[in-house]
């Protein structure tokens, strides 16, 4: 039941996020789009902040299952959305169930493979992507046409998203909780509070995306954001055993980087996409994010379990430092791809 509820909840989140971006890019002036895309990532960071602060209290004094009820508040917003979102002309459309199925098979199998390094999921993932490629070439009414991926800028942006976003929860969900508990010998509750300033900074930076966009081009903003992400990972890798304040500062830089990157990266991805195809483009963009994040959690957790020691040393600190160096190399690869 919990898994089913989580599937429904995640589906709603993915749809809401994608539809918001589609609304912004279709109905708002181009000069305002970065501002409102920034509000989206700011809201996400703020939600993470509130989740960290309230989940412990709810789990302790009520029940962790009560957290599922929080999302019911969103039902109250439906009348407002119905009244304020402009109506659009509806057309008959074919839902490519088979194409979506192949994508789901590929994505889930790839995540399982990265988490376990078992050959069967790898084979299933390869079969899934092969069948998807065959499907879009062999049939007409598919979720996307092959020509869609001939747009070099869009494909490059998707690669950057896949690579860089895989590091997003590697730091906050794997390294920081583990380092706080096993390196600094403090509680997981402490780890949650150390993450709070990072999400707060991310929310502020996201809300200021419009102002940042007026002073920096999309390219410069993206490179600055990627630089912040890389610096955060390298800083933590070098000083992880020194003080927990290092983790706080790193998380602030890290969250600021992702918040700054979101709006200009979306804008770059769809810059050359025809207006009638932006919905599909944004859908695949968010699909890539939703694939990259669990992939990152899977390989980061696997590295932690393997007790990896890249630069010598022993103990838990050396393991988490090595994980961070791997994440830093991956983030650097994302910068190279973008360049």
Residue ranges: model-predicted function:
Residues 2-4, 8, 63-65, 113-124, ...:
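Interfacial loop-to-helix junctions that mark the boundaries of transmembrane helices
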Residues 60-160:
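Hydrophobic transmembrane-helix bundles of small-molecule transporters
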Residues 12, 24, 143-309, 316-339:
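12-transmembrane solute porter fold
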Residues 1-92:
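Helix-loop-helix hairpins in multi-pass membrane proteins, especially solute transporters
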